[in-house]
Amino acid sequence: MELFYASLVCLFVLLLSLSFLFLFNKKNKSMILSCPLPPGNSGWPVIGETLEFLSTGWKGHPEKFIFDRISKYKSSIFKTHLLGEKAVVFCGASSNKFLFSNENKLVQTWWPSSVDKVFPSSTQTSSKEEAIKMRKMLPNFLKPEALQRYIRIMDHIAQKHFQSWENQQEVVVFPLAKRYTFWLACRLFVSVEDPNHVARLADPFDVLASGLISIPINLPGTPFNRAIKASNFIRKELVAIIKQRKIDLTEGKASDSQDILSHMLLTSDENGKFMHELDIADKILGLLIGGHDTASSACAFIVKYLAELPEIYDQVYKEQIEIAKSKGPGELLSWEDIKKMKYSWNVACEVLRLAPPLQGAFREALVDFTFNGFSIPKGWKIYWSANSTHINPEVFVDPLKFDPSRFEGNGPAPYTFVPFGGGPRMCPGKEYARLEILVFMHHLVKRFSWKKIIRDEKIVVNPMPIPANGLPIRLYPHHVKT
């Protein structure tokens, strides 16, 4: 009998708790829904404000879309309609902190539909789910001891790369920077080092990257259509590489730790299943895009700013030539050398602030929530903008001035410098990018000084900033008196 009464009491308490929880959630949701949506405009039917969002980048001023609306609505949060989706743009350090701190709680990563169509996974999962799996695989490849091993490989390839610059009076920087970073990615991800093989893959990757974030109209000649064709071509090439690697692993001609491709082939999931060839090709394709595109933009803009600012160039040269003098004949760069490149990295960071390869990124609201007094409905897309802090005079004094000293000591305030994102979604290849950029700077400045040929070359952002004419420069080798 006592057990019966005890059970009744427990049941009563449980029902009371559930009722209270229901009322609390209902009240909480009511409070959320009672808050207004952020101010803003949905633009034209169907396309919304997508064309204006993209066109400001094509004109070289992607921040204009952001700052014009901040000024118009007197709010750092505003609603819009982008890439076929209802969206809210979050601006400022507090917004960055909120989004990065609530990853997988209130928001999750989101890609436009064009990305899933350009990267048609061989599995029945979305690119979002595949990215989560990929991020679980990367730590072994990007752990400190692995990165330290890559420095020698990067140095070796950089030396071979800059041989193509020698005996040239003029070069066009951006395509050469892309060749350098793509060569590194091919070597370190899939052990493809032959220049002819790298070149065969490089051009389709350029087409793919330019059409990745585009209006998904699959008609002949559109950037989206060209991106799909390029993706299909690259996947076939990668499948051929994967098939050969399987043979090489079986015959002992390849090792299980030589690159991320071997790791993928030999690693099973929690159910003991191995990935299919097309699945691996999808993931390698994504890695090759992320592993070279952003760094090539950064390298090109480093060349641009060092040409415009000879006093900055002189300081970088001084640091790098001291490192070069400390090396014996044929001795490759080491981790200790990289740690000495402090001023060079401050310069690179200032370049990333003024010309961030990652202009921003999208999230999706997992639930209804409020922020800064505004209601954000479940399912709406959220875009955060790097430029909203990077060139904001309230965050960085005289924001358009090139000043590497901003990164001395503790550097910028948290959540204000976000070229690699932040929180759980921070780019896992940040340290990899740092190494390839610093190795590039080392070999560039110890060999050459240079001048821009087009003084006021236009910048185009699509989706990353690139010089409209590729940044042609005139080279002055250091061993030649000029």
UniProtKB/Swiss-Prot annotation:
Membrane topology, as annotated: Single-pass membrane protein
Transmembrane segments: 4-24
Entry keyword set: Heme, Iron, Membrane, Metal-binding, Monooxygenase, Oxidoreductase, Transmembrane, Transmembrane helix
Domain of life: Eukaryota
GO cellular component, one term: membrane
InterPro entries: Cyt_P450, Cyt_P450_CS, Cyt_P450_E_grp-I, Cyt_P450_sf
Pfam families in the record: p450 (PF00067)
Localization terms from the record: Membrane
GO molecular function: beta-amyrin 28-monooxygenase activity; heme binding; iron ion binding; monooxygenase activity; oxidoreductase activity, acting on paired donors, with incorporation or reduction of molecular oxygen, reduced flavin or flavoprotein as one donor, and incorporation of one atom of oxygen
Binding of heme, residues: 427
UniProt key word Heme: yes
EC number: 1.14.14.126
Cofactors: heme
EC category name: oxidoreductase
Entry keyword Heme: yes
Reaction(s) catalysed by this chain's protein: beta-amyrin + 3 reduced [NADPH--hemoprotein reductase] + 3 O2 = oleanolate + 3 oxidized [NADPH--hemoprotein reductase] + 4 H2O + 4 H(+)
Family membership: Belongs to the cytochrome P450 family.
Protein name, as recorded: Beta-amyrin 28-monooxygenase
Organism name: Solanum lycopersicum
This protein's encoding gene: CYP716A46
